[in-house]
Amino acid sequence: MQHATDLISIIALGLVCAFIGGMLAQRMRLPPLVGYLVAGIAIGPFTPGFVGDPALASQLAELGVILLMFGVGLHFSIGDLLAVRTIALPGAIVQITVATAMGAGLAWGFGWGAGAGLVFGLALSVASTVVLLRALEGQGLLDSDKGRIAVGWLIVEDLAMVVALVLLPALAPSLGGEAMQAAGHHGPPEHGLWVTLGLTLAKVGVFVAVMLVGGRRLIPYLLGLAARTGSRELFTLAVLASAVGIAFASSELFGVSFALGAFFAGMVLAESDLSH
């Protein structure tokens, strides 16, 4: 009987290659993350040999980011995040603006159009969440003031990219692309742009409010129910269900990234007695 083993094969080969790459990188006195990246390239579609399913790999990567950001959120409280807002908020906005402008200028030098230049600049303006957090953990800086500022910076970048991804389709006509408007929409582009932007900001605001008000009560309560059963398995399952479920619901209902939803889930849990 033939079985579909795409998921098993990509997990098995991925873990084996990541282990080998991490060990080799450690022997060369490099961060293991370098070996993990090389392992990903080795089983990717642009190198000979085994090629992992890109769709499955992407979803597994998202799952890894969800669990990573949930764990990072457990190290933070809402007070920690608010304490660095005066640095992280303006700093991230200025950095995104400057990096986007520099990237767009470089693209203009390559002869690219305005739309391609803007997308290229935005891609250069944000940091890799996984790489930065792993580097902070490796240096023991995640729980320091610098680490909190860096995480706050990442949150601002994530929110900024949510807005950017909404605005880019609406701005496509003026940037040399094609508009992506909903079927049946015949209003003026300006009206559609501002309505879309307003709805996006409202969704993000509602998401933050729901997590800070409802999540601070609901998540600890549900985990408390699991803890009182005395079953370690049920408690672990409740934690995983909270991280993945909230991340998925946040993306589907409010349009935020999986990583941001998982981070807020971990952060609200950090303020409960069950965070350890």
UniProtKB/Swiss-Prot annotation:
<keyword id="KW-0813">Transport</keyword>
<dbReference type="GO" id="GO:0015297">
    <property type="term" value="F:antiporter activity"/>
</dbReference>
<protein>
    <recommendedName>
        <fullName>Uncharacterized protein in phaC 3'region</fullName>
    </recommendedName>
</protein>
<dbReference type="GO" id="GO:0005886">
    <property type="term" value="C:plasma membrane"/>
</dbReference>
<keyword id="KW-1133">Transmembrane helix</keyword>
<feature type="transmembrane region" description="Helical">
    <location>
        <begin position="5"/>
        <end position="25"/>
    </location>
</feature>
<dbReference type="GO" id="GO:1902600">
    <property type="term" value="P:proton transmembrane transport"/>
</dbReference>
<dbReference type="InterPro" id="IPR038770">
    <property type="entry name" value="Na+/solute_symporter_sf"/>
</dbReference>
<feature type="transmembrane region" description="Helical">
    <location>
        <begin position="104"/>
        <end position="124"/>
    </location>
</feature>
<dbReference type="InterPro" id="IPR006153">
    <property type="entry name" value="Cation/H_exchanger_TM"/>
</dbReference>
<feature type="transmembrane region" description="Helical">
    <location>
        <begin position="64"/>
        <end position="84"/>
    </location>
</feature>
<feature type="transmembrane region" description="Helical">
    <location>
        <begin position="32"/>
        <end position="52"/>
    </location>
</feature>
<keyword id="KW-1003">Cell membrane</keyword>
<feature type="transmembrane region" description="Helical">
    <location>
        <begin position="244"/>
        <end position="264"/>
    </location>
</feature>
<feature type="transmembrane region" description="Helical">
    <location>
        <begin position="149"/>
        <end position="169"/>
    </location>
</feature>
<dbReference type="Pfam" id="PF00999">
    <property type="entry name" value="Na_H_Exchanger"/>
</dbReference>
<keyword id="KW-0812">Transmembrane</keyword>
<feature type="transmembrane region" description="Helical">
    <location>
        <begin position="193"/>
        <end position="213"/>
    </location>
</feature>
<keyword id="KW-0472">Membrane</keyword>
<comment type="similarity">
    <text>Belongs to the monovalent cation:proton antiporter 2 (CPA2) transporter (TC 2.A.37) family.</text>
</comment>
